[in-house]
Each structure stands twice: as C-alpha cells, then as structure tokens.
C-alpha cells in the first residue's frame, strides 16, 4: 500500500476522486474487517493497481456465449450483432492467431469492431498479423505481444473516455443536477463505467473461484454471467434514454444516518448469485445515491428508496458491507462505531491483488 499519489495508476476499486465525497480536508474513516475504525487520508486507502484489463475468454467459453447469444436473440439480427460485438473485442485476434476461426467468421468479427473500440493504427497492425497467419507464416511471439498490448490499450482508451464523461455527470449529480442524464451518450457512459467496475472487483473474481470449486467447472458460467451483465448494462442505457422501462434515479438521504461506501461500491439489490434483474445501487456521497433499474421495480420491490428512513439507510449500508471485501469507508467515525458495519468477505491480500 502506498500513501503517495501516482496519477498514472488507478487507486483501488473506488477511485480517490469518487471517495472524496466522504472526506473532510482529504481525511475519511476506514474500517478493515472487524478492526476498529481509523482515520486515514484519501491516498492512504488507495491501492496503486490498474483495474481495466478484462479477463481473457478461451475458445470454448467464447463458443458457449456465442450459442447463448444465438438462442437468446433468435430472429433479432441487430441485437445479436450488438451483443456479439461486446464479447468479441479483444479476444478475436487470439482466436484468429490460434486458427480457430474460418475466414468468413473472421470477416464477420472484423465488421463488428468499430473505431469506438480500437484505433486505426491498431487495426492495421492486427490486419497484418491476420494476413501472416493466413499466408502460412509464423507470427513471432513479440508481434503477438504487441497485439495483446494494443488490445489492452484499446480497452484502456475506451474506459478512459467513459471515465472522463462519468466524472462530469457525477459532479452534476452531486450538485443535484440530473440534466446530463437527458443525453443518451451520457447515460451510456455513466452506466458503462459504473457497472464495469462491478465486474472487476475481488468479490466478483471470487465468484469464479467458487463456481470452479463447487461445480468442477472452469469459469464458463462466470464468463457467461459477465457477458450477460455487459449486455444488460448496454441495453439498460439504450432503454433508459428512451424513458420507457429503465431509469437512473437520484436518491436523496435526508435521515440522520449517512451512506457508507465500500471497496465494491456498487451492488445489485436483488442479491442473487445469478440475478434476473439489474437493481443497481450506487452511493455517490453520504447524502446521495443512484438507482439504475426498472421503473416498475423501483415502485414495488425497491419502493423504500423513494422515501428513505434511518432503518432503510442502515439496511442499504449493510448491503454495501456484504459486498465489500477488505474495507468500508465513512465520513464520520460515529457511523462505523455505533453499528456492526464491517467488510463481510475478507480475503487475504495475496488472493485479492495477485490477479
């Protein structure tokens, strides 16, 4: 752990800028497991670790989610195309280099990759590698390393664009201004950034280990869950922009109890291991939170969010604790001392940060 700020590296799973809403003059309260709460600086609780590299998808897993997509979106070519685009990048070139795809399949995959995901220079490099593969030439390992690196850089570039837009929207929401959410691109950026963080935490990685241990299956189900989430969050953004079924709702906390935040900052209120709904709850300050999900469920299963009392805030804080792995954070020591709030899924540092 480092107390020094390094602007080139991500800080933990909750960026320092996000945590700043819980800090007074750069200081906030943190609780590790069942230990006593302690005062720390924003940068004192940040881990210098990049979190934007997606897990690689093996060929068998790729084929599994492809079949899943074909069954799910049978007869809806536009939706299938959109879905496959999301799961294809950046694994397509690994499949090509392994000789796993036919030429026609490669053409389809190439057609799905757009400038939104990858630069022209990277595309040109990958095309040269592809040409070498099909001419029978051996592609040097160092070239493939460059391709792999470019894949990661492409994702980083995409996420940085989402991140930049996210901070603008977040600043507005913290002021109580929801007008940025009237713009479709802003909605997409906000949903994509926040829900992608949900997929990149130690808690989520632990799910893969659990599946493998309990069912003697590799991470196919874990990958499928990730892909379903990734599809749903894009669908959520598209539908929300049309103001029909889904919405992003700013929730105000006027009780005498603050929202806390954890190292897994966003939770699905449904709480099932393989959830059927996307009832995503994200505190953005001690006094404000965001709900992303179906309008109907906000009026039924999650109606308490529309009229919070101290008991419901306490319940939401406990959900944050349940999802957290190592640490929870609060603006006031009293919030952590007066209740049995603690991170509920403690894992050794070596397991959490070795991936």
List each model region and its residues.
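Alpha-helical structural context detector biased toward long hydrophobic helices
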Residues: 2-355
């Amino acid at each position: 752990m480092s107390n020094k700020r390094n602007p080139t590296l991500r800080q933990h799973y909750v960026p320092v800028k996000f945590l700043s809403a819980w800090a007074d003059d750069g200081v906030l309260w943190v609780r590790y497991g069942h230990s006593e709460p302690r005062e720390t600086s924003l940068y004192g609780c940040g881990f210098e670790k990049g979190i934007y590299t997606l897990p690689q998808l093996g060929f068998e897993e790729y084929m599994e989610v492809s079949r899943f997509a074909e069954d799910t979106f049978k007869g809806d070519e536009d939706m299938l195309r959109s879905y496959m685009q999301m799961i294809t990048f950046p694994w397509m070139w690994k499949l090509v280099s392994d000789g796993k795809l036919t030429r026609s399949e490669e053409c389809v995959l190439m057609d799905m990759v757009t400038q939104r995901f990858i630069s022209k220079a990277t595309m040109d490099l990958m095309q040269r590698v592809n040409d070498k593969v099909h001419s029978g030439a051996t592609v040097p390992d160092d070239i493939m390393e460059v391709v792999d690196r470019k894949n990661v850089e492409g994702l980083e570039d995409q996420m940085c664009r989402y991140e930049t837009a996210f901070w603008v929207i977040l600043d507005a929401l913290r002021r109580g201004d929801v007008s940025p959410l009237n713009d479709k691109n802003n909605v997409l950026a906000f949903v994509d950034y926040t829900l992608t963080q949900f997929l990149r935490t130690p808690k989520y990685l632990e799910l893969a280990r659990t599946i493998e241990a309990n069912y003697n299956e590799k991470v196919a189900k874990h990958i499928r869950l990730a892909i379903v989430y990734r599809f749903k969050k894009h669908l959520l953004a598209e539908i929300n922009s049309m103001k029909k079924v889904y919405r992003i709702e700013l929730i105000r906390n006027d009780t005498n109890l603050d929202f806390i935040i954890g190292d897994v900052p966003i939770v699905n209120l449904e709480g099932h291991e393989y959830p059927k709904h996307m009832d995503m709850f994200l505190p953005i300050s001690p006094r404000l939170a965001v709900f992303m999900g179906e309008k109907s469920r906000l009026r039924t299963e999650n109606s308490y969010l529309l009229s919070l009392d101290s008991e419901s805030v306490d319940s939401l804080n406990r959900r944050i604790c349940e999802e957290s792995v190592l640490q929870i954070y609060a603006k006031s020591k009293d919030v952590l001392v007066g209740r049995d709030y603690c991170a509920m899924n403690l894992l050794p540092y070596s397991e959490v940060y070795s991936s």
